[in-house]
Amino acid sequence: FLLFLVPGLLLSPDSWAQDAQKGARPGKVTVSGRWVVRADFFGTPIQLSMELKQEGDKLTGEFSGDKLEGTLTGNSIHFAAKDEQNGTEECDATVKDDTISGTVVFANADDPEPPSTHKFTATLVPERRPGPPRRHEFTPTTFYRQFSAANKPVLTVSPGDTIHTSTVDAGGKDEKGISRVLGGNPETGPFYVETAAPGDTLAVHLTRLRLNRDWAGSDDYMVGRALDSDLAVKMKDVGKSIRWHLDTEHGVATPEKPAEHLTRYTVPLRPMLGCVAVASNLAQAAPGTGDSGRYGGNMDFNEVVEGATVYLPVSVPGALLYVGDGHAAQGDGELNGNALETSMDVEFTVDVIPGKRIMGPRVASATHIMAVGLEGSLDDAFRAATANMAQWLTDEYKLTPSEVAQVLGTSAEYKVSEAADRNAGIVLKINTERLHPIAPPAK
């Protein structure tokens, strides 16, 4: 099972309970729906997901992703759930005013530690807001440097809504070159997405990424992962700042003060976001905005461009979406430790895929699906990307392990997306034309 810690100020239990109570049910108790469970683990509040399906007095569904079976007798609930590692959860609770409260016992047959019992309450995830999608114009005044659930949301939006905003560059400078915040990939957000709950997937459709100034900062440094001993010696004197001119009329970037052999060197502009993230699971300390992981973060993947969709696993209510670290262009791996760092004009549309559990970040373009692996070494990132894509093919295309192996063995394209940061990044791409003959069933 997965544990999700969320500070009290962001649990929004009152607002969720009020939304649920608007549809309060007279007469017989019914509990079908998606619930957010708030449990106390030895003094630490944690967050879990629960989905209940009721047929008469019989209950089925999932508790933090584990299949459950149980009963509803009057207003009393009892169910048991089990995971694939012999972990079990047994729940006894009471329903009152659209709130479920009780205890859950966690145990594992293979663990010598005795079972632990924890009190919890659960509230219904509200339904989507009625009416057409909205468009939001948001001008940021505060920028955060952690992908934290403790940061106050700057704006509340609904699935289907579009947000138009801007980002500062990695050093904290805005479109006028004015320092607005300490550097280190300061982020715009977080945006609270209504109905997003632990166990869901947030889809971020990047509808517009445009440069809003004519220069970018970078350097001539080379990251250690890219250097053998001989090249490291040759590169011992590099590390100077390099400023680039961004010519949006011709769509190219050039060094403002080019070295002798780079006087005619140009790079095509391809605006991208180095950071797209949801708030991390705060069972551990919130990661800084230079880090990456299951929550996305500083992925520095150069195909997170206009027209792409980024998928991220939700760990906290509202997802708490962050965007930032705009790049005018970047080669694979971000080998300089920086790309062409610049501020950005950004527009995106958000959506929520309820109950869709993915193991890590994913990206989709008009031509490819792309699974991201982010780990401490390139080898481990390679494995993580492969596992992420295997899950995608299994869940969406219903492929068997043998079929997954055949597809990957004939169609996998791997890219080194990130070599500069604590976590390395590998992306496994598959051209969707290869998958058309085995397209998933229509939903």
Residue ranges and their predicted role:
Residues 208-304:
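Intrinsically disordered, low-complexity linker/loop segments enriched in Gly/Pro
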Residues 269-298, 302-379:
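Conserved mixed alpha/beta catalytic, RNA-binding, or beta-rich assembly cores of soluble enzyme
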Residues 130-179:
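N-terminal, Lys/Arg-enriched amphipathic/low-complexity engagement segments
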Residues 18-116:
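Central antiparallel beta-sheet cores of small beta-barrel/beta-sandwich binding domains
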Residues 139-148, 180-187, 287-295:
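Short, structured beta-strand/loop micro-motifs enriched in basic residues and often containing a Trp
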Residues 1-12:
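Bacterial N-terminal signal peptides
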Residues 170-181, 209-220, 318-328, 417-420:
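Short, Lys/Arg- and Gly-enriched loop/turn segments at beta-strand edges
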